[in-house]
């Protein structure tokens, strides 16, 4: 999975897909009451990027629904995963439950259209910290209460704050989540980061019977040398400001026979058995 980073303006969707991304990350900004308002990262952000691009969240969902719906004029077959980077750290943790309800309802109304949409992308909920876990509970409660629990099959969980992996496992256990879990490891492209935690996540992913990590990705990679390092370790995905660079690295002799781009036929919730 090549995840285009910080794709917050509607016009950026095609831009990043044209560069080779098959997944996109969008930042969800909330008001003080936990209502999802806009797709927006804000300052500071990655080096060399414009931090202020934005869109109304519901309008973004209306557009991306078309982009991921077969036979729609806007359909782009390659886009199979949407990572919602939830800016919960900007609101009180007491509002995390309200935020989860709101995002679930907006997805139901504007993306899935309560069963009337054929939009097919998988959804990854990127949670900043384990203290925000009530968002997950609320999201799942809302799907159940609204009568659409079946959409849980399309939704995965990912904690992005580089916290202790055993701490994350404990929270997932409390929430009763034993599948459809991704694990991110990374830092803004402005800084260097070692591989100790990334290696630990990959080791846990590959441990038989360990159900709390199905996929691992590294972020935000812009240098080809770091992309190569991550691929050698065996990551499932790379988040980048430059998907075209990832494409070029994947075509190199060292990687061409080991990796390929994920398609809709690849289940993002299953561990890869190479």
Swiss-Prot record:
PROSITE patterns: PIPLC_X_DOMAIN. Binds 1 Mg(2+) ion per subunit. Its cofactor is Mg(2+). InterPro entries: PLC-like_Pdiesterase_TIM-brl. It is found in: Secreted. One of its GO terms (molecular function) is lyase activity. Mg(2+) binds at residues 25, 27, 85. The keyword Amino-acid biosynthesis does not apply. Its EC number is 4.6.1.-. It comes from the Eukaryota. The active site is at 5, 41 (nucleophile). This is Dermonecrotic toxin SdSicTox-betaIIB1bi. It comes from Sicarius cf. damarensis (strain GJB-2008).
């Amino acid at each position: 999975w090549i995840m285009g980073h910080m794709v917050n303006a509607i016009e950026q969707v095609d831009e990043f897909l044209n560069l080779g991304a098959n997944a996109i990350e969008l930042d969800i900004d909330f008001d003080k009451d936990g209502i999802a308002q806009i797709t927006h990262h804000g300052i500071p952000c990655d080096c060399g990027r414009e931090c202020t691009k934005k869109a109304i969240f519901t309008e973004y969902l209306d557009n991306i629904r078309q982009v991921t719906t077969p036979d729609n004029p806007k359909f782009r077959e390659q886009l199979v995963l949407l990572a919602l980077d939830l800016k919960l750290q900007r609101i009180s943790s007491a509002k995390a439950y309200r935020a989860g309800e709101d995002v679930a309802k907006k997805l139901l109304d504007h993306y899935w259209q309560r069963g009337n949409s054929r939009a097919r992308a998988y959804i990854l909920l990127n949670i900043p910290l384990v203290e925000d876990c009530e968002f997950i509970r609320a999201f799942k409660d809302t799907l159940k209460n609204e009568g659409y629990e079946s959409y849980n099959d399309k939704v995965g969980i990912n904690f992005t704050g580089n916290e202790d992996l055993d701490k994350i496992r404990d929270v997932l256990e409390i929430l009763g989540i034993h599948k459809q879990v991704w694990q991110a490891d990374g830092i803004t492209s402005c800084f260097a980061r070692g591989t100790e935690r990334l290696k630990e996540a990959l080791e846990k992913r590959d441990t038989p019977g360990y159900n709390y990590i199905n996929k691992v990705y590294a972020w935000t990679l812009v240098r080809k040398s770091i992309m190569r390092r991550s691929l050698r370790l065996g990551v499932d995905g790379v988040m980048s400001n430059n998907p075209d660079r990832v494409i070029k690295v994947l075509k190199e002799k060292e990687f061409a026979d080991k990796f390929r781009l994920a398609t809709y036929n690849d289940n993002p919730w299953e561990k890869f058995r190479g």
